[in-house]
């Protein structure tokens, strides 16, 4: 109707490439019924609790250790694997936000956490390399999130909320978040709108976000149910979004 052509073959090829990437990612994280991995050997009764909303270190007990091939009782220097503890300050990759990095220390060794992932059954996996000594199941461990990594990730996470508010102010209340990605170096924010933004609109949004950043508004953490969150005036939730009870 408007002399627009669609490269259907190219679209289908790109879609299939993305499907392959998604399947491979699920295999790495054992997410949503992925292929069997070493994590399937773990006792399903074992769980992890995240306690890192207001601190970056904690003491915990090591409940599971794995190499890349099997569940083990100990890791030695040079081993690559996963550490699971009962309580952790490490945030796992989810909701478009990359998981924390840092170190796990025991009296006998040190493990460098290269990424943190969410596993089936409420487990949080700290994936990385044993860089010094050894550690065993049952050891008391000191969990230490990288302060710089967490701080930069938090800044970009907060920026997505500032950006959403600025977009709704400039473009209208029809704007809804459709996805996002956050890590220490960048953010991506997907949203609904009827057309491409003009240079003037982009400049207005940028000015609003920068003004709010300059105000240094205090950031607080509240843990609440979805129903409670829907009653808070500053919260804009997507009507179609599926979330847990907390």
Residues of each region from the PLM?
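Single conserved hydrophobic/aromatic residue that forms the stacking wall/gate
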Residues: 236, 243-246
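A glycine- and charged-residue-rich anion-binding loop/surface
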Residues: 1-238
């Amino acid at each position: 109707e408007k002399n627009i052509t669609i490269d259907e073959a190219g679209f289908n090829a790109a879609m299939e490439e993305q499907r392959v990437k998604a399947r491979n990612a699920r295999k790495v994280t054992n997410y949503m019924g992925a292929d069997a991995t070493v994590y399937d050997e773990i006792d399903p009764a074992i769980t992890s609790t995240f306690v890192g909303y207001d601190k970056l270190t904690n003491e915990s007990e090591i409940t599971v250790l794995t190499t890349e091939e099997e569940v083990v009782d100990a890791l030695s220097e040079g081993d690559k694997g996963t550490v699971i503890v009962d309580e952790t300050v490490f945030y796992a990759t989810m909701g478009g936000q990359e998981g924390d990095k840092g170190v796990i220390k025991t009296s006998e060794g040190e493990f460098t956490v290269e990424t943190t992932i969410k596993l089936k059954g409420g487990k949080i996996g700290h994936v990385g390399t044993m860089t010094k000594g050894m550690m065993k199941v049952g050891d008391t461990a000191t969990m230490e999130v990288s302060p710089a990594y967490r701080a930069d990730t938090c800044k970009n996470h907060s920026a997505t909320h500032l950006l959403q508010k600025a977009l709704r102010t400039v473009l209208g209340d029809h704007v809804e978040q459709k996805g996002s990605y956050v890590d220490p170096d960048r953010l991506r924010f997907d949203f609904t709108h009827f057309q491409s933004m003009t240079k003037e609109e982009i400049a207005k949004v940028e000015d609003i976000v920068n003004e709010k950043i300059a105000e240094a508004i205090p950031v607080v953490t509240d843990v609440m149910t979805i129903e409670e969150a829907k009653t808070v005036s500053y919260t804009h939730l997507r009507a179609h979004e599926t979330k847990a009870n907390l």
